[in-house]
UniProtKB/Swiss-Prot annotation:
Taxonomic source organism: Homo sapiens
Protein's recorded name: Leucine-rich repeat protein SHOC-2
Membership in a protein family: Belongs to the SHOC2 family.
Compartment annotation: Cytoplasm; Nucleus
Domain notes: Contains a N-terminal RVxF motif that is important for interaction with PP1c.
Motif (RVxF motif): 63-66
Gene Ontology BP annotations: cellular response to growth hormone stimulus; cyclic-GMP-AMP transmembrane import across plasma membrane; fibroblast growth factor receptor signaling pathway; intracellular signal transduction; negative regulation of neural precursor cell proliferation; negative regulation of neuron differentiation; nerve growth factor signaling pathway; positive regulation of neuron differentiation
Function noted in UniProt: Core component of the SHOC2-MRAS-PP1c (SMP) holophosphatase complex that regulates activation of the MAPK pathway. Acts as a scaffolding protein in the SMP complex. The SMP complex specifically dephosphorylates the inhibitory phosphorylation at 'Ser-259' of RAF1 kinase, 'Ser-365' of BRAF kinase and 'Ser-214' of ARAF kinase, stimulating their kinase activities. The SMP complex enhances the dephosphorylation activity and substrate specificity of PP1c.
Effect upon mutating E503K: Impairs SMP complex formation
Cellular component terms (Gene Ontology): cytoplasm; cytosol; nucleoplasm; nucleus; protein phosphatase type 1 complex
LRR repeats: 101-122, 124-145, 147-169, 170-191, 193-214, 216-237, 239-260, 262-283, 285-307, 308-329, 332-353, 356-377, 380-400, 403-424, 426-448, 449-470, 472-494, 495-516, 518-540, 542-563
GO molecular function: protein phosphatase 1 binding; protein phosphatase binding; protein phosphatase regulator activity; volume-sensitive anion channel activity
Superkingdom of the organism of origin: Eukaryota
Mutation effect (K134E): Impairs SMP complex formation
């Protein structure tokens, strides 16, 4: 029950145009980072007849899995399911487009198997959208569309492209995602005006040397294929800003990657990388580097020269240490993910290395101590995830972490929380589940901004009265402790929507629970000594989920208990002083 530590608006413009490289980079950055896997959204096109379509949402933890494919613009059909168009209907659309001299044609989601050859007559087209059909091939006549700048062919069953496409000298954006390509069609290498090329989710095994011909490319996405190596010629793509090769089978990168000095976003997550070339330090514009889920055991010192780096994700590798002073050299770094590695100690480099860090994720390592003063210069550190380490205590300057907003210390071996937790006045999320806590400090009541407090699976026997001061608290998880009672002050937590009290030793609930007017979920399961419920529970008008499994509740008729939460609430209303509410 822990919280994670760590919408684009559709635009409508009169004149449809392909987004510039700078715009795509900006949109890619806004779409998320490298920490979470994301599902690609339905691309959108600009145009006065564009309508809102469905969007897929993703899964981060801090630092978030960056997917550059989210930035394509293409038209959305009216809400509903895939259209089934007859050949006559498609021809009708083509005729209409010709008569109106339209520059943009959307035939997406029509279940088209074969594109009519009369498409060749639409030579005025600059944008053609054929995504989400059933095309296995394109007619050669598409090569007659010499003014085409955008061609969207994703989500079909294409295995090749006609050579006639090399007539498309103005083509800037080509989208071939989610097809059945086993190689990059040779004609693609001849489309030397391309600035954006999407090849995600095919069956491609190699990238040919001819990739060097696409020297104008600013965005190349070949993620989710079966590519084992990149050619040295990748280094000739000097205008490349975003390179997405995630989810392939790369073991090494060519040293020539260092020639792509304009790259700002480099996504290499989910490969088999064993090392990185020293030339990666030449990427002076690099702002986001995704390396999660590889086989790296070391990071080159040269990475320190990437002074523009803002986000670095190294989750799930075999790294036990970083080059000394690496982090302090990365003066713009704000998000660092080192989760699921082999760290036993904090990175060497002193307090200055965290001075710009906003989010630090060290989850699932072997760290047993947070050094005193390590965050003394971390004035903007807001999110710290130390879940699943071997901490037995917290540093003496713990109370000075005043900028902390989300703190996850779950699954450690903490036996107490220092009283000066009261200094963490900005804290909104505090996760302390699965530790060895027997009591809580009174200073906890000073965390007036706290929205979520998770204390599941500890050894708590009571709660301090000061918990009543946490009036912004929305989620309180106390499952699997040794509580016998709750303080009456619990009734002051009027913003509480979720209260987890299962697997304790509660004998009763205080009548003040009836003041929790926003409570929606109440978990009381597995309290073997809980024989009754207060009539005041009937006042919790928003309560929609109540778990009472394995509670004796002997003071209630068995048939009422068997009926579940709604029967119980109704019974409490009928039998208690609040029957007038029925």
């Amino acid at each position: 029950m822990s919280s994670s530590l760590g919408k684009e608006k559709d635009s409508k413009e009169k004149d449809p145009k392909v987004p510039s490289a700078k715009e795509r980079e900006k949109e890619a950055k806004a779409s998320g980072g490298f920490g979470k896997e994301s599902k690609e959204k339905e691309p959108k096109t600009k145009g006065k007849d564009a309508k809102d379509g469905k969007k897929d949402s993703s899964a981060a933890q801090p630092g978030v899995a960056f997917s550059v494919d989210n930035t394509i613009k293409r038209p959305n059909p009216a809400p509903g399911t895939r259209k089934k168009s007859s050949n006559a209907e498609v021809i009708k659309e083509l005729n209409k487009c010709r008569e109106e001299n339209s520059m943009r044609l959307d035939l997406s989601k029509r279940s088209i198997h074969i594109l009519p050859s009369s498409i060749k007559e639409l030579t005025q087209l600059t944008e053609l959208y054929l995504y989400s059909n059933k095309l296995q091939s394109l007619p050669a006549e598409v090569g007659c569309l010499v003014n085409l700048m955008t061609l969207a062919l994703s989500e079909n069953s294409l295995t090749s492209l006609p050579d006639s496409l090399d007539n498309l000298k103005k083509l800037r954006m080509l989208d071939l995602r989610h097809n059945k390509l086993r190689e990059i069609p040779s004609v693609v290498y001849r489309l030397d005006s391309l600035t954006t090329l999407y090849l995600r989710f095919n069956r491609i095994t190699t990238v040919e040397k001819d990739i060097k011909n696409l020297s104008k490319l600013s965005m190349l996405s070949i993620r989710e294929n079966k590519i084992k190596q990149l050619p040295a010629e990748i280094g000739e793509l000097c205008n490349l800003i975003t390179l997405d090769v995630a989810h392939n089978q790369l073991e090494h990168l060519p040293k020539e990657i260092g020639n792509c000095t304009q790259i700002t976003n480099l996504d290499l997550q989910h490969n088999e990388l064993l090392d990185l070339p020293d030339t990666i330090g030449n990427l002076s514009s690099l702002s986001r580097l995704g390396l999660r889920y590889n086989r790296l055991s070391a990071i080159p010192r040269s990475l320190a020269k990437c002074s523009a780096l803002e986000e670095l994700n190294l989750e799930n590798n075999n790294i036990s240490t970083l080059p000394e002073s690496l982090l302090s050299s990365l003066v713009k770094l704000n998000s660092l993910t080192l989760a699921r590695n082999c760290f036993q100690l904090y990175p060497v480099g002193g307090p200055s290395q965290f001075s710009t860090i906003y989010s630090l994720n060290m989850e699932h390592n072997r760290i047993n101590k947070i050094p005193f003063g390590i965050f003394s210069r971390a004035k903007v550190l807001s999110k710290l995830n130390m879940k699943d380490n071997q901490l037995t205590s917290l540093p003496l300057d713990f109370g000075t972490w005043t900028s902390m907003v989300e703190l996850n210390l779950a699954t450690n071996q903490l036996t107490k929380i220092p009283e000066d937790v009261s200094g963490l006045v900005s804290l909104e999320v505090l996760i302390l589940s699965n530790n060895l806590l027997k009591k809580l400090p009174h200073g906890l009541g000073n965390l007036r901004k706290l929205r979520e407090l998770d204390l599941e699976e500890n050894k708590l026997e009571s709660l301090p009265n000061e918990i009543a001061y946490l009036k912004d608290l929305q989620k309180l998880v106390l499952t699997n402790n040794q509580l016998t009672t709750l303080p009456r002050g619990i009734g002051h937590l009027t913003n509480l929507t979720h209260l987890g009290l299962g697997e304790n030793l509660l004998t009763h609930l205080p009548e003040e629970i009836g003041t929790l007017e926003n409570l929606e979920e109440l978990y009381l399961n597995d309290n073997p000594n809980l024989h009754s419920l207060p009539f005041e529970l009937a006042l919790c008008s928003k309560l929609s989920i109540m778990s009472i499994e394995n509670c004796p509740l002997s003071h209630l008729p068995p048939q009422i208990v068997a009926g579940g939460p709604s029967f119980i609430i109704q019974f409490l209303k009928m039998q208690g002083p609040y029957r007038a509410m029925v």
